[in-house]
Amino acid sequence: MKKYLFIVCLSCGMVFSQDPLSGVIQYQDNNKTYPLIGASVFWKNTTIGTVTDIEGTFRLERAPDTDILIISYIGFKTDTLKISTPFISHQMIQNLQDELDEVTLTQRRRAYQKSLIQTQNILKVSSEELLKAACCNLSESFETNPAVDVNFTDALTGTKQIKMLGLSSPYLLISEENIPMVRGASQAYGLTFTPGTWVESIQIGKGAGSVANGFESITGQINTELKKPITDIPFFLNLFASVNGRYELNTHSNHKFNNYWSTGVYVHGNKRSQKFDNNNDGFLDLPVSDQINLMNRWQYTNLEKGWVSFLSWRYMNDEKLLGALSYDPKKDRGMKNRWGSIIKTKRMDASFKLGYVFPEIPYQSFGFQTAYSSHDQDSYYGLRTYDINQQSFYTNLIFNSIIGNTLNKFKVGLNYSFDDYVEQVNGYSFNRMDQNMGGFFEFTYDNNDNFSWIAGFRMDFHNNLGTFFTPRLHLRYVPIEKFVIRLSAGSGRKAANIFAENQTLFATNRIIKIQSKQGKIYGLNPEKAWNYGLGLSKSFSIGSPHQITLSSDFYITDFTNQVIVDWEHPHEISFYNLKGQSTAKSFQFEVDYYYRNFLNLKVAYKNYNVQIDYKSGLMQKPLLAKNRFFANLSWESKITSVGKQWRWDLTYHYVGSQRLVNNFIDHPKGFSPSYSLWNTQLTRVFSKKFEIYLGGENIGNYRQIDPIIGVEDPFGADFDAAQIYAPIFGGMIYSGLRLKI
């Protein structure tokens, strides 16, 4: 098989030596031309560099002391070009057939990347990083990075919830290829509906995000990029099994019809049929579950004319059975014989994306996105019922260009969203329709050398939230080489879907109280907050093999209005609007160490101070560890001539004590004990096509004692399975294999 590398570099705008350089990098495989995504492009002996995007294009600021450009990518020989004129049209064709086996790997793309060049504080997690843990789905994809905290939501569903900057996932904008995904009805379980093997990369942005992505992000944005048919391998198979009775199958099948059209079919299935009660309380530690997940993607790419488009559809069916070990839904539903629950969810998604880059003006482009989703959940918890159906439509139009030169960029666009909710709680209906039309403008001064900034604003017209203005600002300053200071500020707001976001309340017998009737959504007013952030990053080397990055950030989220979820009364859960103050302060310090790209150590300390004015007074948010410590050690052996390799990973989590609400019998008005968790995985790569892995989670077997309050009387007023501060199941061993053809 012959591969050729094409490099076309074009300077943009006026003929001045300081003007940035733009270009496109492509490769040819069997006479077919494809964009080379993720290629490193940098000026020799400098830190000024970038990577190519999904179209293979890049834009790079000029270096003051060199005109030597280096382009590198794994599997291709590193190329060096002399850029001698301000306007250049260069094409290089190189036959690499006889040199591929002799390439010396001097630098590989890191699976965990914190950029010093980007203005915003964004962490990129690649699919290689996700292989370090049992990433069966998106909710389990954050165990090996310190930016996101992962916790179980209750003692029954086995569902994991993520938190960032001390606040739960509803305050995050969780998107899929920049289309809002986990929101509304899918907030509780939506992260479990994206299989881990489908994920190409995850971008985690802290603080106020871009106005182009909407107004709902308050603490940040998590965006998932899925595998692309044109770059994914033709066939992939993953088999997974664990001692907790979970079995999983993942297959990817991709086909390229010609230079323009590609398609991929992705199948995921998981099943847990075994029942476990390791703590002997008569309740299942993990639900009996069954899920099927299908996706088909079509991709059209025409680099010569500047077009790229995606058409995707997905179908998912998920069922969970939880509750008492001997619960039989056919006999016991609606009765007080045994407590049980069934959660059935069906979801369908369809999306279309179209992008155009002007061939003669590569810095100018427009994009169009539209998506439809149908989410239907039928469920009951003991004697309580909860059903929700959400029909959503979203569309986005965006135009990118420059003002004068490519240092001054802007984007402008329109968003429209529509959500129709049909919701029933114990027979009471809470139906509503949300519609929003918004416009945005964002300006970027993109000077990678010393100072860059992004300022954006948007205006939205929402039928339930009103008309409102959203400003956001990001600053980046480089006082000395490889030392970056970032500042950010911005506002956000959202409608609180109080039942969908807090489905753990149905795992209790608490009385539900909504203590407001003034707002348009459940009688409550929308949530509004400002987020402010400061970040510091410094990279340096200790000799050529040792590379270290020190980073710290401090964020404050200040709510001007919030829907308070009050668990303080042992037999009630109350929802009401904030009267007083609610502030979340988050501090993180991280050390990231690399040795010759084969050994990586990440260490982080996090501190949270989240204070809320409840009706009973100002208190720290319950079930939130004020102090957390994280460490991850990864090692990879050198790849042999036949592709064999060992990979090993060890992760440590220390979770500090957490404030408990008043109905904890063992710790009345107190705090939970602190604890530690250890996870590890060993992978043996036999060739480029086949590998096996063996891992363990919570190998110290730490468990919360008596996780269900009032378990002896599940229909009594004291029953509460929502007060969870630690794992329930204990240790878990898993194994699997991956086949790539």
Label each region the model flagged.
Residues 4, 601, 654-661, 683-741:
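C-terminal beta-signal and adjacent terminal beta-strands/loops
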Residues 26-31, 37-44, 72-76, 86-131, ...:
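Short, acidic, small-residue-rich periplasmic hinge/interaction motif at the N-terminus
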Residues 58-61, 161, 179-206, 294:
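Short acidic/polar hinge/loop motifs at secondary-structure boundaries
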Residues 86-93, 138-141, 160-163, 175, ...:
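N-terminal periplasmic accessory domains that precede
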Residues 139-180:
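Extracytoplasmic beta-strand/coil segments of soluble accessory domains associated
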Residues 272-293, 299-366, 372-390:
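Flexible loop and strand-edge segments within Gram-negative outer membrane beta-barrel domains
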Residues 365-379, 478, 486, 523-577, ...:
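Membrane-embedded beta-barrel scaffold of Gram-negative outer-membrane proteins
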Residues 446, 550-558, 577-661:
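Gram-negative outer-membrane beta-barrel transporters
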